[in-house]
Amino acid sequence: MKLTCVLIIAVLFLMDNQLITADYPRDEQVYRAVRLRDAMQKSKGSGSCAYISEPCDILPCCPGLKCNEDFVPICL
């Protein structure tokens, strides 16, 4: 009985992992948050201003943000 339960749970777990990763090619199995972050960075383009929490010592902050120069200059 215990062995049957363990086997059923193992099969369900393996099927679940297969279904989750089936949507993405083998080389692109990365976390959803990483894919979202990369997509957001690509959509920004090269840009000529620093976005929030980016350093503002080289580029000026984008409109609506201020350069906080307390410890490390970053846009807030």
From Swiss-Prot:
Domain notes: The presence of a 'disulfide through disulfide knot' structurally defines this protein as a knottin.
Disulphide connectivity of cysteines: C49-C62, C56-C67, C61-C75
Family, per entry: Belongs to the conotoxin O1 superfamily.
Compartments, as annotated in UniProt: Secreted
Keyword set, alphabetical order: Disulfide bond, Knottin, Secreted, Signal, Toxin
Reported tissue expression: Expressed by the venom duct.
Cellular component, GO annotation: extracellular region
Residues of the signal peptide: 1-22
Annotated protein name in UniProt: Conotoxin Lt6.1
Propeptide regions on this chain: 23-48
Top-level taxon: Eukaryota
Main location: secreted
GO molecular function, one term: toxin activity
Species per Swiss-Prot/TrEMBL record: Conus litteratus (Lettered cone)
Name of a matching Pfam family: Conotoxin
